[in-house]
Amino acid sequence: MQKMTVLAALLSCSALFSAAQANEGAHWGYEGEIAPANWGHLSSEYATCATGKNQAPVDIQSTVKAKLPALPFHYQAGGNAIINNGHTIQVAYAEGSQLTIDGLPFTLKQFHFHAPSENLIQGKQYPLEVHLVHGDPQGNLAVVGLMFEEGKANPLLTTLWQQMAQQVGSQLTLSKSVNVADLLPHDRSYYRFAGSLTTPPCTENVRWLVLKKPMTASKAQIEQFAKLMGHPNNRPVQPLGARQIVE
């Protein structure tokens, strides 16, 4: 039941992901007294942000070599609304797009952005990262992370940024549903680790899959997102502890 409550609160389009937690619990953010270092002390609901042992994001360095199965993305055009929840820009996704992990179907609920990246790869921080958030009927969560490096403009980002909600709390219907598969690289090799949500309540037992190959976004696209946020919206990397990262 607790998993289902978290899934409903964090992934429902009407809940607006992070905004729901801000409304239902203590206000949190990325600067000052409500910055990531203090999240665990803002509310008892956020205690895991401070006490959790399997927190995300992480710096992906030492890894264990394994024969990870290919990720079977079954995505279709379903991104239909763009939301500015004050913490990120999020695109709500209609039902029907799935990713199978460990033999289980996870439905894509939404995707959102962080600048700079939250996860690091070999100590490198990218200027932008997108998180594709999935859930299953039992309330389990899986997040695919994809990095962007500065380069050519990304066509899908162009479409999204042209319709980006400017006011906090605003939601706009996209003129045409987008397919997040258009963001994915051809090389979909990845790292896998056990982690958490990177925002309060920092719920753990999240399957994390970080793609190795970055895509590109133009300097103007990166700056446009950063300007709208007004400040970095990334949680610092968390201790890896006893966890292993598999590739």
Q: Predicted regions: what is each one?
A:
Residues M1-A8:
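Bacterial N-terminal signal peptides that target proteins for export
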Residues M4, A20-E247:
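Alpha-carbonic anhydrase
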Residues A8-A15:
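Bacterial N-terminal signal peptides
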